[in-house]
């Protein structure tokens, strides 16, 4: 299969904003792809070489490396490449223009390369894999030579998307949900197969693997798919409410209630003597927690399992729970064994999804919890999350206050009974978060996605000082603007912000972003931040839940304030538009709706 086919489809996809059109075009690409390499095609569409959970290196190629490779491939002086890049702001477009110029002036033939020698997807994939995996002395020069070699063989359009792929900035506006729908259309006979494909992806979060199974065995093979140790399950997510009475009513009057710990959610896999730890974002974080690997090996029973819990920093002297920030300090230390001494951790387990070749995601919570408790040996490091069973509001409140007093964020209220399955990859009312209230503020924080930035004035002139934030709409796979955040940042964070956003800056709005407000710069929807505010209000400036509460208006957050970055969350893990609407409906209503803030100031 020629890489040109993918490049041509990427070129079309980049110009489309309609999700339906994106999906149809993507389905067409998948149906025309070589089935023998369908997994690689899917990974390339996702903008990666392999799933994050494998823990393999990313391409990690900086601008200077790419400029050098483009310079060699197009026989252009490096300074000229750099100047063109400064003028255009897109290295992919720089590569396209220089390759076009090279072809038109006949230099290509002079250099001994032939446009008839087409670039194959297999060749692109194997070469880029070598670039990613090459380390040690001389690796820099080898990486540049390998990239330059690919670019020499590429036509202008191929060069554009090769460079963007290596940068990690394809800019074609495709999320995993769109890929899933396209796979259902291409291989499953239509949109009706989406649920089958989505269920399989939720149990095995590897789109390339799912595509390979479909083309080799058919869509029916996905129906019997079970979790597999080493491939993470997409985590079950909770809804949120701030009223204990309503929560208990939602779950049917009785529930299992766990402490909600302020740590890092972890999915732990074991097969024989091998143990893997995956983050909430399904990244392989095993190397960050050698102590947890040791604890699981020592204090759990079973040859093969997938369990879930929270890794929490604890005080080395008292054993008391420390904050999430303490855990982040540990992750920033270069010497992991020194970090283990300074920031020890405990693991609080709360679920079991797979055990000894049996899929437990379809079994009730009480069955899963009972088995989980039976495989943990008595010890001081790996424990079952502190929990009780409640059937009245008083007990729920009492346990909630106890959780807060002992350093927790609140509690997780979980439905029990035969229907209380593990809903992989889904957010629903089987689990409900009850977190502490914030005085004079919203009942809970929200996690929003950065989609744009605004330049400051005065001493912050010319630098980003506020952010356009959006909530995720899973129904449309888009990000809808909610607020503009300008407070809560330290000077150090603002300086860091400038660098972060410049790396993901876009010339135009991302196809998955829905916003009336025009920021000074648009960015890729990559970063997630935790935000608090005074209340949720109706606003004509924002698109979150537009026309749902009031015609021509959406919902916004009044007096939003930045709390922290949520590096553990992907953009699709952000607070949903439905959750924002639910929070709006639950907050005490004033006689007159708060006027929208003029966010242009």
Curated annotation (Swiss-Prot):
Residues 568-601 are annotated as: Disordered. Pfam families: DNA_ligase_A_C (PF04679), DNA_ligase_A_M (PF01068), DNA_ligase_A_N (PF04675). Gene3D superfamilies: DNA ligase, ATP-dependent, N-terminal domain (1.10.3260.10), DNA ligase/mRNA capping enzyme (3.30.470.30), Nucleic acid-binding proteins (2.40.50.140). It is an enzyme of class 6 (ligase). Its EC number is 6.5.1.1. ATP binds at residues 258, 265, 280, 310, 350, 427, 433. It catalyses: ATP + (deoxyribonucleotide)n-3'-hydroxyl + 5'-phospho-(deoxyribonucleotide)m = (deoxyribonucleotide)n+m + AMP + diphosphate. NCBIfam families: dnl1. DNA ligase that seals nicks in double-stranded DNA during DNA replication, DNA recombination and DNA repair. Belongs to the ATP-dependent DNA ligase family. This is DNA ligase. It comes from Saccharolobus islandicus (strain Y.N.15.51 / Yellowstone #2).
């Amino acid at each position: 299969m020629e890489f040109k086919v993918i490049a041509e489809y990427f070129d079309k996809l980049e110009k489309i904003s309609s999700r339906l059109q994106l999906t149809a075009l993507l389905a067409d690409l998948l149906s025309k792809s070589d089935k023998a390499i369908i997994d690689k095609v899917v990974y390339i569409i996702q903008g990666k070489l392999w799933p994050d959970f494998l823990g393999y290196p990313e391409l990690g190629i900086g601008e200077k490396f790419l400029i050098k490779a483009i310079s060699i491939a197009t026989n252009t002086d490096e300074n000229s490449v750099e100047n063109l890049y400064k003028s255009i702001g897109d290295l992919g477009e720089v590569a396209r223009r220089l390759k076009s110029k090279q072809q038109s002036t006949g230099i290509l033939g002079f250099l001994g390369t032939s446009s008839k020698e087409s670039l194959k997807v297999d060749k692109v994939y194997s070469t880029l894999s070598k670039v990613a995996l090459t380390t040690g002395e001389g690796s820099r020069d080898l990486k540049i030579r390998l990239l330059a070699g690919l670019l020499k063989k590429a036509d202008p359009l191929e060069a554009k998307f090769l460079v963007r792929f290596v940068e990690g900035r394809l800019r074609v506006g495709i999320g995993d949900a769109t890929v899933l729908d396209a796979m259902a259309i291409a291989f499953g006979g239509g949109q009706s197969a989406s649920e089958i494909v989505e269920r399989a992806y939720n149990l095995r979060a590897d789109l390339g693997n799912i595509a390979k199974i479909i083309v080799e065995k058919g869509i029916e093979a996905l129906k019997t798919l079970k979790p597999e140790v080493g491939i993470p399950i997409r985590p079950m997510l909770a809804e949120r409410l701030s009223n204990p009475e309503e929560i208990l009513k939602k779950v049917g009057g009785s529930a299992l209630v766990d402490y909600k710990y302020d740590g890092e959610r972890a999915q732990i896999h074991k097969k024989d003597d091998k143990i893997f730890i995956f983050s909430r974002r399904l990244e392989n974080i095993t190397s960050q927690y050698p102590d947890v690997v040791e604890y699981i090996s020592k204090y759990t029973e079973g040859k093969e399992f997938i369990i879930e819990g929270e890794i929490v920093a604890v005080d080395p002297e008292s054993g008391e729970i420390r904050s999430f920030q303490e855990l982040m300090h540990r992750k920033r230390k270069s010497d992991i064994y020194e970090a283990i001494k300074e920031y020890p951790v405990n693991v609080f387990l709360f679920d079991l999804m797979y055990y000894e070749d049996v899929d437990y995601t379809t079994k009730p919570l009480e069955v899963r919890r009972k088995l989980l408790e039976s495989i943990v040996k008595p010890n001081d490091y790996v424990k079952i999350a502190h929990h009780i069973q409640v059937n009245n509001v008083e007990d729920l409140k009492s346990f909630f206050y106890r959780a807060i007093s002992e350093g927790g964020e609140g509690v997780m209220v979980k439905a029990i009974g035969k229907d209380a399955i593990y809903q992989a990859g889904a957010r629903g009312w089987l689990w409900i978060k009850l977190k502490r209230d914030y005085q004079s503020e919203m009942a809970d924080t929200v996690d929003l996605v950065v989609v744009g930035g605004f330049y400051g004035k005065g001493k912050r002139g010319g630098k980003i000082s506020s952010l356009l934030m959006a909530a995720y709409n899973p129904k449309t796979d888009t990000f809808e603007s909610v607020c503009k955040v300008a407070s809560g940042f330290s000077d150090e964070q603002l300086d860091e912000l400038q660098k972060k956003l410049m790396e993901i800056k876009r010339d135009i709005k991302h196809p998955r972003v829905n916003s009336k407000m025009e920021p000074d710069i648009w960015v890729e929807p990559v970063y997630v931040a935790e935000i608090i505010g005074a209340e949720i209000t109706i606003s004509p400036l924002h698109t979150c839940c537009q026309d749902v509460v009031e015609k021509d208006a959406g919902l916004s957050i009044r007096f939003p304030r930045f709390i922290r970055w949520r590096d553990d969350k992907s953009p699709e893990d952000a607070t949903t538009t439905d959750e924002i609407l639910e929070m709006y409906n639950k907050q005490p209503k004033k006689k007159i709706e708060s006027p929208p803030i003029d966010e242009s100031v």
